[in-house]
């Protein structure tokens, strides 16, 4: 019997949709009692930390669908176009709002996605 390698797992995960990845993360968090959220920085560092954070410009953004709005069909179409998800996966993502439509994208790509989703009637947030 062939042994599954780390590379096999990585290749399998690469083929998963955004919705499937989200569900996988939730299941792993529950199974191992951990959180995938980034730890909150301690605020006791003082004003020097605030200056450093302001100087470092954010380069990766997440596009979060907060609500589908009244025109859900158009929002699903835009989500499919932006993510290459199938119809069912895109519908599940829209129905399960709030959820990430795109993660780790450039500022321009995030703004374009936000514009398209808002035009379709969705409520969107860029983080």
UniProtKB/Swiss-Prot annotation:
One of the record's GO cellular component terms: cytosolic large ribosomal subunit
Keywords: Ribonucleoprotein, Ribosomal protein
A GO MF label: structural constituent of ribosome
Pfam entry (one): Ribosomal_L12_N
GO biological process terms on file: translation
Keyword Ribosomal protein (UniProt): yes
Keyword Cell inner membrane among UniProt keywords: no
Subunit and interaction comment: Homodimer. Part of the ribosomal stalk of the 50S ribosomal subunit. Forms a multimeric L10(L12)X complex, where L10 forms an elongated spine to which 2 to 4 L12 dimers bind in a sequential fashion. Binds GTP-bound translation factors.
Functional note: Forms part of the ribosomal stalk which helps the ribosome interact with GTP-bound translation factors. Is thus essential for accurate translation.
Stated family: Belongs to the bacterial ribosomal protein bL12 family.
Protein name per Swiss-Prot or TrEMBL: Large ribosomal subunit protein bL12
Organism: Pelobacter propionicus (strain DSM 2379 / NBRC 103807 / OttBd1)
Underlying gene: rplL
């Amino acid at each position: 019997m062939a042994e599954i390698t780390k590379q096999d797992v990585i290749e399998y995960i690469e083929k998963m949709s955004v919705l499937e990845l989200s569900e996988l993360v939730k299941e792993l968090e529950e199974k191992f009692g951990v959180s995938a959220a980034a730890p909150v920085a301690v605020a006791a560092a003082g004003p020097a930390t605030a200056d450093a954070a302001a100087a470092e410009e954010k380069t990766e953004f997440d596009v979060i669908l907060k609500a589908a709005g009244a025109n859900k069909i158009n929002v699903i179409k835009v989500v499919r176009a932006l993510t290459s998800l199938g119809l069912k996966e895109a519908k599940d993502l829209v129905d399960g709002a709030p959820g990430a439509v795109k993660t780790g994208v450039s500022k321009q790509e995030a703004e374009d996605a936000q514009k398209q989703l808002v035009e379709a009637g969705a409520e969107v947030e860029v983080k």
